[in-house]
Amino acid sequence: MEEKDFIVNVGPQGTFKPSGLYHSIPADIDAMFLRYEATSVKKITIYFHGGLVNEKTGMATAIKMEKHFSSIGQTPICFVWETGLIETVASNIGKIADTKLFGKLIKILTKKLSSKLGFDISEGRGAGVTLTNAQVEVELSRKNPFENYTQRNLESKGRGADASTNLPAKPEDLEGEFKFEIESDFELISIVGESKLTIPNAGGGQSRGIIDTALLIKSLAKIAFRVIKRFVGKRDHDFYPTIIEELLRELYIAELGAWVWNNMKVKSNDMWKDNSGISDINQYAGRYLFDKLVDFHKKYPDVQVNLVGHSAGSIAICNLLKMSSSNYPQLIFDKIIFMAPACRIDLFRDEIVLHENRFKTFRMFTMTDSNEKHDLLVPYFYTHSLLYLISGILENEGNDFDAYVLGLERDIKATPPYDSVKEITDSNKFLYEAGKNRTAFSQTDGTASEGLRTQSLSHGSFDDDDATIGSIKFMLS
């Protein structure tokens, strides 16, 4: 089978416009459905890879999944909609981490916050005894720095942030402490004078430029206050990742590339726009295929259509469901399968949980929270998974923290402080409904039934995991 026989490449703004070495045209999709008619196709599976990869990886994934689906009698359609996010973010994180200024700021923040949050006693140092420079250096030399600095460890010793009595009421309360730290470090002052950072401007936006020590003091106080507030509200992502998230949000959001994530989400929606009055490669690729699928379904209403999505592919599927229900509700999808879904829980609730009439079966494969926290996105620097980074800083172009993401077990369990969030409790009831087997957490043990087995230990590896792929093939057979 040639690539054009099963791959739909989505270009800029969700159209057929070329964006790389490979591109699709409307005629390719026309030919697909002519072949389906000629061969009396009865089962179609549409696959969406994660919107986090480049063209080469997206194409390789499509070719791999085509073989899996074809081997069980499914006719595959694989969307390739590359954005390169993972390369952009990982590369930018590495560049930021390598700067002298960043290294200095991390040391200042970890020393100050370890004591403020109660890790002084929980780690056996005694009340008010801060980490030494040598201790900080030792932690930062580890692939997973401050791994044991968690809410659970604090609470087990009665030292949760909410148990402290000397916490600041506002960021300004911390400025004096950071003022002493910064103004006594002449090397840091010199580095600050040579560094450009992204800072809030008078217009309410952000601009990039040199900052002075006074502004840096205010920024560090804001970062520390937000970390403390997240710990008190139990909305943290553990000690070190939370500090990294808030430091990036305050001073490095533009350099991080949060805009890439937003652009990917926009593309996942744009591809389903109406093509009325548009022609040729200016048409929206997803909608063009959908309209052809509708015509095919009208002729052959017994055709089975499945949707499978990995990571951000779940967002594309949710957007497809919204559009499909408005334009052709007669198309009921047979099975919807998510792997490590990166969609927000409110989107999932609105398009899947509240509309079970749109499909027959749903299942999600994702990691346990423990495994999610040991999937090191960037060792030594951001030490939780990509889904944690999305939740912590990428949603809403950096303006949201601890956004609710479907693939994170900690969010869908609906335990405090998430037990009063409506979209979470609604989704929890759906996902854990007795007898439905809608969730499988990696790694499953030897007692897991066929169709519920998964062994992946990294966000990006679900589509390479034999157990997960075997479960999906079992479901679709």
Show where each model-derived region lies.
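Short, surface-exposed "cap/lid" segments of acyl-processing enzymes
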Residues: R35-K95, N166, K170-E250
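Short His-Asn-centered micro-motif
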Residues: Y47-H49, F79-V80, V308-H310, F338-A342
